A protein has these predicted regions:
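N-terminal loops that bind phosphate or other acidic moieties
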Residues: 1-130
């Protein structure tokens, strides 16, 4: 795993979010104020803008910086929760593991950090269930 793979994955997330923009916006308008899509798009764009600065850096450092960028650019509770997920992932990177194993371990840690911060768990109709 390296910074290039992380930014490639983030770009794929951006593409998927852009493809489902209308659906995401509609869902947010039904339960919120409808601005989630704009906030998350801004956060991802600004995170992708870090690519040159973070090129060649260790994956845990890249994830931590992306998490901090999400925290400062995505409003509301979703910014805090997504940044917690990503920064939680950064704490478990181990360069001795395969990419697949690292992703599994890191994502599990990120989800646990998000559950703790949001004081929620699966099945409670939160972001974790989506």
């Amino acid at each position: 795993m390296d910074s290039e793979k992380i930014f490639n994955a983030l770009n794929q997330i951006k593409i998927s979010i852009d493809q489902h923009k209308d659906e995401i916006e509609k869902l947010d308008q039904e339960i919120g104020d409808g601005d989630h899509i704009f906030n998350i798009q801004r956060g991802i764009k600004e995170s992708l803008d870090l690519k040159d600065e973070l090129s060649g850096k260790a994956p845990n450092e890249v994830l931590k910086k992306i998490g901090m960028k999400i925290m400062t650019t995505v409003g509301g509770s979703s910014g805090a929760l997504f940044s917690t997920l990503i920064m939680g992932m950064s704490k478990k990177y181990n360069d001795e593991l395969s990419d697949q194993k690292n992703i599994a371990v890191m994502f599990t840690e990120g989800v646990e950090a998000m559950k703790k911060r949001g004081k929620s768990d699966l099945g409670e109709k939160t972001m974790l269930d989506v």
